[in-house]
Amino acid sequence: MNDVTTAGTSAKITVDPDDFTFVHYETGQIVDVVSELGGLLGMGNPVHVIVDETTPAAKLSAGVDGTSSDAQVTIHAQSGALDDFQRLTHFGADNARQSLGRMMLRARDRMRADFADAPADLDLSLRQNAAWDAYCAGRLARAGVPMSEQRWRYNYRNRFGFSDAVDADFDRLWAADDLGWHDLGAD
């Protein structure tokens, strides 16, 4: 496990594995992205990123071991979530920012009392996942991370339907900053 405390932040960022053999990633690339996101999102929590480099799938999950500002955030990422879309098996900083940023926001949400009822990431329904992704992606966009609103709108429509009412609900999630779990409307 590579253990790094980055300059300008007190957050301890660790990455597993230390050395990648199936994908062309450097641990430092992941540390840099997580450190940058920590600054953008105002998160100083220690973060542990575990990358499954044996699959090109893009599944992500995040967990947190408490509700304090020093609670450990653990992110599990299949390597496809961090790949450069133009050069698969190579690190893509933009894709990593979007993927890891969504998981960091989920972890930050989970530290709030109004997210206490949220299921673990791997237990979320497709609708719950789509709603939370829309909420996180909108916040990332406002923080300065380039996000494709249309991509997340389409993902949301695929789970909730194609209608003006569904689009209005997506717009509400995309523009929101302080929703609780039950406000996401995907129960």
Summary of predicted features, one role per range:
Residues 109-113, 140-145, 178:
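Hydrophobic/aromatic-lined pockets within catalytic cores
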Residues 159-187:
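Pan-zinc metallopeptidase signature
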Residues 120-155:
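Post-HExxH zinc-binding segment in Zn-dependent metallohydrolases
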Residues 2-80, 138-139, 143-145:
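Auxiliary, metal-adjacent structural segments of Zn-dependent hydrolase domains
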Residues 88, 117-118:
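N-terminal, positively charged nucleic-acid-binding surface of large information/translation enzymes
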Residues 81-99:
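Short pre-active-site segment immediately N-terminal to the catalytic Zn-binding motif
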Residues 94-115:
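Active-site recognition of the HExxH zinc-binding catalytic motif
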